[in-house]
Amino acid sequence: MRSFVRHQLWPAVALLLAITVITGFIYPLAVTAVGQVVFPNQAAGSFVAGTDGRAIGSSLIGQAFSDPKYLWGRPSAAGADGYDANASGGSNLGPTSQALIDRISAEVDRLRTANGDAPIPVDLVTTSASGLDPDISPAAADYQAARVAAARGIALDLVRQAIARHTDGALLGFIGQPRVHVLAVNLDLDGLVR
């Protein structure tokens, strides 16, 4: 029995404790420390600050905009009212789900009422996997540009310039699609962040 404890049980318990300390304490603390030093903004949540320095959003999490003077992001299925970071996730509704069909139909009606009868980009009626996507396609931004310009009483070209300033291309030129950051465009148009 003593041989079993000394040769098998004690090394197993010691290894368990060592791995617990390394992976549960040392590694997370080291990664957090490196993150705070090398990427302080990202480690703190990638907050976007207004001109007064106060956090007004995050560059990683979408927000609900419904005022006609703002670009609207993708619909969100995260939480009861959407854009709930505590309930991140898609709707899990299948393509034959009547609830999904009704939601998309209502979104199409809302967009047509606000923007006219132009073809609606698909990302304005479909949710992302997380339900918190902060970006839309350039086509979705351009689709809304005339509405935003009219609601603000500014030239359409000024809205398109703001969209162009906050459009990122594909990563490394070939990974992913070009995307427009909704919050950044809206803040730019408000003159809050440059």
Feature-to-residue mapping (PLM):
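Extracytoplasmic/periplasmic C-terminal soluble domains
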Residues: R147-R194
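Short alpha-helical patches at coil-to-helix transitions and adjacent helical residues
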Residues: I19, P138, D142, R179-L183
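Residue-level signature of transmembrane alpha-helical entry/exit and packing/kink sites
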Residues: H7-L16
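Short, low-complexity, intrinsically disordered N-terminal peptides in bacterial proteins
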Residues: M1-S3, R194
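Flexible, solvent-exposed loop/hinge segments and secondary-structure transition points
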Residues: S3, P11, T23-G24, L29-V31, ...
